[in-house]
Regions:
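A short, polar/charged loop-to-alpha-helix boundary motif
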Residues: 92-110
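A general marker of short, structured functional hotspots
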Residues: 1, 35, 67, 110-111, ...
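CN hydrolase (nitrilase-like) catalytic-core segments centered on the catalytic cysteine
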Residues: 4-94
Length: 129
């Protein structure tokens, strides 16, 4: 599970994969604005880089005590970064149900050897304060 704002940081997505994740859910309450553009590119990137499925969930509606307009558009992507079915509605609550072939995880990880080819010796600066 990766929650809302965390999705902007690839290090955590990688840690989930290295710890055996095959499916990562990312619940969010994200309103329109700059991050709407990122909504459809970050999670497929996490799926590809880590060879797992991603379920990206965002709420819809407007907060009564503010002007936040939440844009929904929940979706699932496979380990190749491809959308599974249609993206959810931008205005109506709905339940998305998707079939996933879990054997795709191993196929993708064996084809794209991103874990094998990574260079942790180069990452010291990523974890320095």
């Amino acid at each position: 599970m990766y929650i809302c704002y965390d999705r902007h940081f690839p290090e955590g997505a990688r840690a989930l994969g290295l710890n055996g994740a095959e499916m990562v859910f990312i619940p969010s309450a994200t309103s329109r604005g700059l991050s709407e553009y990122l909504w459809r590119i970050e999670q497929p990137s996490h799926a590809v880089a880590n060879g797992y499925f991603v379920g990206t969930i965002n709420r819809v509606g407007i907060e009564p005590l503010g002007d936040d307009d939440f844009y929904g558009q929940s979706y699932f992507v496979d380990p190749r970064g491809q959308f599974i079915g249609d993206v959810g509605d931008a205005h109506q609550e709905e339940l998305l149900v998707r079939d996933m072939d879990l054997s795709m995880i191993e196929q993708v990880r064996q084809t794209w050897q991103f874990y094998r080819d990574r260079r942790p010796d180069m990452y010291d600066d990523l974890v320095a304060p």
